[in-house]
């Protein structure tokens, strides 16, 4: 085993996921030194795009595998984590240097639920990644490992002096989330008294309550992204105080809006816009404003991989850093609410059926 570590990328067949794999293959310092585990829901029917990309892995001597993980199933997540942990423990594959939680789910014209009984956006974007991360902590590189969460402006972010997109800012009437969060009941994703179950179970901003309202699905996606950012902050704080895991870094990146299949469950106009128009506009948008709202998957993949491996500008242990593309940014006010974050963490332990001994994180409860 000559590799320095393992890189795991969830959702490797999607637009950004495939671009991340392509960028890893393109970098000589990564393709030969790291073993790749690229997860897809179905390694046959759901992997055509990434399989085409991986056709040239052999020519750059990149050892890798496709691993089936259905993030809509907690049992599937547990099976995959057991498999990875077993192989790291017996030396078949090296410890995890980078765990990139890329997979996502968004829908506007439908409202889907998992067999576990959760809202699909909540489970795929957040809960399954929460479970996978805690289960895999034992297999992380304890000196240099990084866990990377993918954020989104749809949760809220603040770049001082540059941009504001916050569910809690009443003056934000023209921002990209303005119409999503205009109704008073949605100006906080978690209102007091804190209730995470409505979001988890799909009762919050449901299609049944808002038939035909495309913003209902966008809100659920944004709320799931808020949960991911709360997880990123909570986990980075807990890991920092853990004597065995304190050298592991937890980072987050907002990759921006890109041409991808994430919008295929939307109205046909939006699908065509994202599929055919945005790919033409994105390169110009990146040239004009590299970290603006619209970006190419190539640019975003570069930012994601940089956050997972860069030491020159981010340092050896960039724990707790949130990036908007390639720039350090700040999360919104609700993501900083310590009580909400703790409540979500504790409730998520119940939702994911996590028990003592499942994770090596000392402050797991």
From Swiss-Prot:
Segments passing through the bilayer: 267-287
Gene3D superfamilies: NAD(P)-binding Rossmann-like Domain
GO cellular component: membrane
Subcellular location per the Swiss-Prot or TrEMBL entry: Membrane
GO molecular function, a single term: oxidoreductase activity
Active site positions: 221 (proton donor), 225 (lowers pka of active site tyr)
Enzyme class: oxidoreductase
Membrane topology reported for the UniProt record: Single-pass membrane protein
Glycosylation sites: 90, 291, 324
Keyword annotations from UniProtKB, A to Z: Glycoprotein, Membrane, NADP, Oxidoreductase, Transmembrane, Transmembrane helix
Pfam families xrefs: adh_short
Enzyme Commission number, as recorded: 1.1.1.-
UniProt keyword annotation of Chaperone present: no
Residue positions binding NADP(+): 16, 52, 70, 102, 221, 225, 260
Superkingdom of the source species: Eukaryota
Pathway as given in its UniProt record: Mycotoxin biosynthesis
PANTHER family attached to this UniProt entry: RETINOL DEHYDROGENASE, SHORT-CHAIN DEHYDROGENASE_REDUCTASE FAMILY PROTEIN
Job of this protein: NADH-dependent flavin oxidoreductase; part of the gene cluster that mediates the biosynthesis of ilicicolin H, a 4-hydroxy-2-pyridonealkaloid that has potent and broad antifungal activities by inhibiting the mitochondrial respiration chain. IccA to iccE are sufficient for ilicicolin H biosynthesis and the roles of the remaining enzymes, iccF, iccG and iccH within the pathway have still to be determined.
Family note: Belongs to the short-chain dehydrogenases/reductases (SDR) family.
Protein known as: Short-chain dehydrogenase iccH
Origin organism lineage: Eukaryota, Fungi, Dikarya, Ascomycota, Pezizomycotina
